[in-house]
Amino acid sequence: MHAPLTAEQRDVYDKYKFATYARSVALTRAQLDQWRDNKVIVPEPVSRAETLRVEAATRGQSKNALWNLLRLDRSTASRSSGGVALRSSALAFGNAQENRLKLANGELFERLGRLAAERAGCPVAETVLDCGMFISAFGLHSASPDAYFAMADGSCVPVEIKCPFNYRDTTVDQMRLELGKANRKYRVKHTALLVNKAGPAQFEVVKTHDHYRQMQRQMYVMRNAPVCFYVVRFKHNLVALAVPRDDDFCRKEAAAEGAAFVAFATENAGRVQFKRGDRRRASFAQNAADHGYNAAQVDALVRRGLYLSYGQLRCGHCDAFALDGPRAFELAMARPHEQCDGLALQEHEFDNVAFLDFTKRYTSLVDKRCDDARALRVDGFYVDDAGAVKTFCCGVHGSNASRRHLPTCSYYLAMGVNKIQNNM
């Protein structure tokens, strides 16, 4: 059982849950041009400060509920490596041994810290043994090394620890004795290590192994990490190697993740148009072959916030609604969308729902020659049959000088949060 999320963890989850984050991705025209020309996006979508905030909130990894939640649907350094999931017994052994190794080998981490300072060209500011999850600059990928060194220049150097179940009772010398005799060097099974057969043991890291790719993805996600330390535990032995950053590998990772980020942003920009009632209505006309709704039913669906896309009814305000277009009208109208911010779902609370329609409000104001009709319509005002200017939502009378709503008015609250500019 995991402890309940704290207020800070809940805030991180609400922002970086993969589906929510992907839906929030957006680009300005200048950023999109930057990507097309140079394959970079400035400023970075996720700042370093935010990355460290997420890391701090997810420490404990598998024992932390937030860490488990943020991994769902997100590409991680270990999952991207293509390896087969470990058996539960081997995984439990590895996790337990990693924790013991970190606690019992202070001298090892002191030596690795000195090497990290040499590679980074600056001193270690902090050694973090209980590491959480790092989010990439684009926010779509993540990595959870076993430990890391926070450097004085703001960079981080990861440490990846492997405790193979198969070598729990095998020393390095015993492992080498079991190797063949035909070759000078042999791959060490279940690791990314290559070792010589004869003479003092000399280890290398194989670049084609999943562990190597995992470490490179960690260095990519952690941005300017110049090196990763690969530590493999045998019985009575530890093998520790420095794995330099592969710039070509990291560039390819950035290109792939950046392309996915731009695709999300483009899709989101296309969806924004359906917050407008006229665009939702047009979707039914443009896809007439995909539905059998009459004009009155289309009007009702549009007012409910629905549009038609690729044969599916979707909500212009949330992701929770998806229904095949030809389904019965009554089913579409009754289908709930939980946590949807579409105002049509609160229409039973409005003073005059007929003027939920943006254009209707504007027409009523223009017909009565009201000054500043465009601004008044955005603020929810219309002119009633008696010639009074009032809000369609909470029924408050107003004017150019006074545009007040009731404090609990759902339209007023949505307008403040979402800066409504188009037809609901």
From Swiss-Prot:
Subcellular location: Host nucleus
UniProt keyword Nuclease present: yes
InterPro entries named in the record: NF-kappa-B_Signaling_Reg, PDDEXK-like_dom_sf, Restrct_endonuc-II-like, Viral_alk_exo
GO cellular component terms, A-Z: host cell nucleus
Enzyme Commission code: 3.1.-.-
Pfam families for this protein: Viral_alk_exo (PF01771)
Keywords for this protein: Endonuclease, Exonuclease, Host nucleus, Hydrolase, Late protein, Nuclease
Broad class of the protein's primary localization: host cell
UniProt-recorded Gene Ontology molecular function terms: endonuclease activity; exonuclease activity
Signal peptide: none
Matches recorded under Gene3D superfamilies: 3.90.320.10
Subunit structure: Interacts with LEF-3.
Role, per record: May play a role in maturation and encapsidation of viral replicated genome, by promoting DNA homologous recombination. Exhibits endonuclease and 5'->3' exonuclease activities. The endonuclease activity displays a specificity for ssDNA in vitro.
Family: Belongs to the baculo-herpesviridae alkaline nuclease family.
Protein name per Swiss-Prot or TrEMBL: Alkaline nuclease
Species of provenance: Orgyia pseudotsugata multicapsid polyhedrosis virus (OpMNPV)
